[in-house]
């Protein structure tokens, strides 16, 4: 069982790293940073929802491949923010991004571990490991809507 979990985590890491490392640049040049980041957020929302419904390892692996475009989001959002900040404030921006990322990772780990434990607790009338995925999909959906609303008209269609 643990080898299977380790294997799926390794596959996910390779897929995410491949998208982020090898496809972000070409995709953003062809379609524009905003479009590719938005596509990555939509893929993440749909795939997180799917993880909550899938019932087989093959289904999980298929969803992992579809999850790959989420790897575009962080570098492209960082790039878009970098272009809005003067050169003498780049360090502050990168420090702020790093701080927010670290707090979100800490909060997310605690929150989703609690969610998983709550919905898998013994004696619950309804147990499901899937609720955490559905909550994550909801969080990413809110992020996607906010991204679209806040950046409306700023960089859509702009190819960099």
Regions found by a protein language model. Name each.
Residues 72-86:
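Intracellular juxtamembrane helix-capping segments at the cytosolic ends
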Residues 35-50:
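Structural signature of the two symmetry-related core transmembrane helices
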Residues 19-33, 116:
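Helix-to-loop junctions at the C-terminal end of transmembrane segments
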């Amino acid at each position: 069982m643990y080898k299977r979990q380790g294997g799926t985590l390794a596959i996910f890491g390779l897929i995410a790293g491949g998208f982020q490392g090898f496809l972000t640049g070409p995709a953003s040049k062809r379609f524009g940073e905003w479009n590719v980041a938005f596509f990555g957020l939509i893929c993440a929302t749909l795939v997180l929802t799917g993880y909550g419904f899938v019932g087989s390892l093959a289904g999980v692996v298929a969803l992992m491949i579809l999850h790959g475009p989420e790897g575009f989001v962080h570098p492209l959002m960082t790039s878009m923010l970098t272009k809005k900040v003067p050169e003498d404030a780049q360090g502050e921006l990168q420090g702020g991004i790093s701080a927010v990322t670290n707090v979100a990772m800490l909060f997310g780990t605690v929150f989703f571990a609690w969610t998983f434990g709550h919905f898998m607790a013994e004696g619950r009338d309804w147990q499901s490991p899937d609720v955490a995925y559905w909550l994550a999909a909801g969080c990413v959906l809110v992020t996607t809507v906010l991204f679209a609303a806040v950046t409306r008209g700023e960089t859509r269609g702009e190819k960099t």
